[in-house]
């Protein structure tokens, strides 16, 4: 169970909810502020002054006054009318993270919902009731309306949810877990669907996967350096200190530790006629380290957003209920674009290392395509082509999405963030990157084994052994698709990087 303190939840807590499926609830100290804001909304609902989302219509219809007798129906209609999502459903782990993020936003005490709403979300997370949420339909302002409406629909006994491995109507799913639908009070429907939690959940998932890929890239690239008999001189600490970028310094230090004690490296420290290695070997800290810095910048933005009140209107500390624009997911869109750039570049330089290792004119005496009998066998020829295809896909997907605004809702919502699909694409990019890195690991392992009797370092030897437990050495040609998939799994689970047994940079 993760106890979330609104405004102070950590990325580690959010990753545990996403990766391990932990339930979450708000810290008890959040309750007084939540209930105070709810009381203020109830007071406004009983008055005559127009308050957006309490006794008015929504969006372009905000100028239309709603009769007091219709305010409950207003909130229910809002949820039903906004359930317009299409496409495949969100992954359950990401949907649960979205629910936890909504808890955090409501817990800031600025949304005006009753504690009953918070308790139902907590109960759904604890009982494993996960709304089925179509993943397409949000433009990231005014919040992630359609996907969050599908979440809220289950809370009022509509929509669909998964529970116990079964997909059920919303009311039945709640009943299965011993929960009851809630009747929405003033503003509560709006508070549930206004916010950036869908986009932020997807962006955080991409961040967590991206960081794991960056760690794997450091380990695998060190193995590639040994396979190619690359120089470790460019890893010297002073080079990186003279530039000063934290990620670059960490990347170089990690690679130095990984390569320490390599007999392959010692064998060509003297007398090597190559003056400089290609950039994909020599500039690894500068590229992967820069990607790490970018991922950390995105992490800072997303950590702030995860703890933010992104509702509209907001109940301020002086009791005023004021319309604003915190629902606009521009920060999330920028963060998603940054993550996409980092993923693309990690993959781009990894693909060049794959190309280097299979090319006999560049690989420093490795056999063509890393096969012991070239000609009769094609070896890793087409595995390299696959990495090129995936690299190109990722380059295409790395184009910014946040710049692609379009007006919606009769021009009332005339600038939007497109953060939702900017964050969603990260999942596919990570899948591609894992295959690129896994294929690099296969090539590097094959290359290092061709250097026998010389051996790599102890940490990298352990990495090679972990890979070989899943992917046998390539001799005669065989179907390689299962090998590429197995290596990609080792990247995505973190097992390959952990096998080195050394500390790796932390997010």
From Swiss-Prot:
<dbReference type="InterPro" id="IPR001106">
    <property type="entry name" value="Aromatic_Lyase"/>
</dbReference>
<dbReference type="GO" id="GO:0005737">
    <property type="term" value="C:cytoplasm"/>
</dbReference>
<keyword id="KW-0369">Histidine metabolism</keyword>
<dbReference type="GO" id="GO:0019557">
    <property type="term" value="P:L-histidine catabolic process to glutamate and formate"/>
</dbReference>
<feature type="modified residue" description="2,3-didehydroalanine (Ser)">
    <location>
        <position position="142"/>
    </location>
</feature>
<dbReference type="InterPro" id="IPR024083">
    <property type="entry name" value="Fumarase/histidase_N"/>
</dbReference>
<dbReference type="GO" id="GO:0004397">
    <property type="term" value="F:histidine ammonia-lyase activity"/>
</dbReference>
<dbReference type="InterPro" id="IPR005921">
    <property type="entry name" value="HutH"/>
</dbReference>
<protein>
    <recommendedName>
        <fullName>Histidine ammonia-lyase</fullName>
        <ecNumber>4.3.1.3</ecNumber>
    </recommendedName>
</protein>
<feature type="cross-link" description="5-imidazolinone (Ala-Gly)">
    <location>
        <begin position="141"/>
        <end position="143"/>
    </location>
</feature>
<keyword id="KW-0456">Lyase</keyword>
<comment type="pathway">
    <text>Amino-acid degradation; L-histidine degradation into L-glutamate; N-formimidoyl-L-glutamate from L-histidine: step 1/3.</text>
</comment>
<dbReference type="Pfam" id="PF00221">
    <property type="entry name" value="Lyase_aromatic"/>
</dbReference>
<comment type="similarity">
    <text>Belongs to the PAL/histidase family.</text>
</comment>
<dbReference type="InterPro" id="IPR022313">
    <property type="entry name" value="Phe/His_NH3-lyase_AS"/>
</dbReference>
<dbReference type="GO" id="GO:0019556">
    <property type="term" value="P:L-histidine catabolic process to glutamate and formamide"/>
</dbReference>
<keyword id="KW-0963">Cytoplasm</keyword>
<dbReference type="InterPro" id="IPR008948">
    <property type="entry name" value="L-Aspartase-like"/>
</dbReference>
């Amino acid at each position: 169970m993760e106890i979330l303190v609104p405004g102070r939840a950590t990325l580690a807590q959010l990753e545990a909810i996403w990766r391990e499926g932990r339930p979450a609830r708000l810290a008890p100290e959040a309750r007084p502020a939540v209930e105070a804001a709810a009381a203020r909304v109830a007071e406004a609902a009983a008055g005559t002054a127009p308050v957006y989302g309490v006794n008015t219509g929504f969006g372009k219809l905000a100028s239309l006054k709603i009769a007091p007798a219709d305010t409950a129906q207003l909130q229910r209609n809002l949820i039903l009318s906004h359930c317009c999502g299409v496409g495949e459903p969100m992954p359950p782990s990401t949907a649960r993270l979205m629910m936890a993020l909504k808890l955090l936003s409501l817990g800031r005490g600025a949304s005006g919902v009753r504690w009953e709403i918070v308790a139902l979300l907590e109960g759904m997370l604890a009982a494993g009731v996960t709304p089925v949420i179509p993943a397409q339909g949000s433009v990231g302002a005014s919040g992630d309306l359609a996907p969050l409406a599908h979440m809220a629909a289950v809370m009022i006994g509509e929509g669909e949810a998964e529970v116990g491995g079964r997909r059920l109507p919303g009311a039945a799913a709640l009943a299965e877990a011993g929960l009851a639908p809630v009747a929405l009070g003033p503003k509560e429907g709006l508070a549930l669907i206004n916010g950036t939690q869908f986009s932020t959940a997807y962006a955080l998932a991409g961040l967590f996967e991206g960081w794991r890929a960056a760690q794997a890239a450091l380990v695998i690239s060190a193995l590639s350096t040994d396979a190619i008999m690359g120089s470790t001189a460019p890893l010297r600490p002073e080079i990186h200190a003279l530039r000063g970028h934290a990620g670059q310094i960490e990347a170089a230090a990690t690679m130095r530790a990984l390569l320490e004690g390599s007999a392959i490296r010692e064998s060509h420290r003297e007398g090597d006629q190559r003056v400089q290695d290609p950039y994909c070997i020599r500039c690894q800290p500068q590229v992967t380290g820069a990607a790490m810095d970018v991922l950390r910048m995105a992490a800072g933005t997303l950590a702030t957003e995860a703890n933010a009140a992104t509702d509209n209107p907001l109940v301020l500390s002086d009791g005023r209920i004021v319309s604003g624009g915190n629902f606009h997911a521009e920060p999330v869109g920028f963060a998603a674009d940054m993550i996409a750039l980092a993923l693309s570049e990690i993959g781009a330089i990894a693909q060049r290392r794959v190309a280097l290792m299979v090319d006999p004119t560049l690989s420093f005496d490795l056999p063509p395509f890393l096969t012991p009998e070239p000609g009769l066998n094609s070896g890793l020829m087409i595995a390299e082509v696959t990495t090129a295809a995936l690299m190109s896909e990722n380059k295409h997907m790395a184009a910014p999405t946040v710049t692609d605004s379009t007006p919606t809702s009769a021009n009332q919502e005339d600038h939007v963030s497109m953060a939702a699909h900017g964050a969603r694409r990260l999942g596919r990019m990570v899948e591609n990157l894992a295959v690129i890195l896994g294929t690099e690991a296969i090539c590097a392992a094959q290359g290092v084994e061709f250097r026998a009797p010389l051996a790599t370092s102890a940490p990298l030897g352990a990495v090679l052994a972990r890979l070989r437990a899943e992917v046998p050495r390539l001799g005669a040609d065989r179907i390689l698709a299962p090998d590429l998939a197995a290596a990609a799994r080792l990247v995505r689970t973190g097992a390959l990087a952990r096998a080195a047994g050394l500390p790796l940079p932390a997010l």
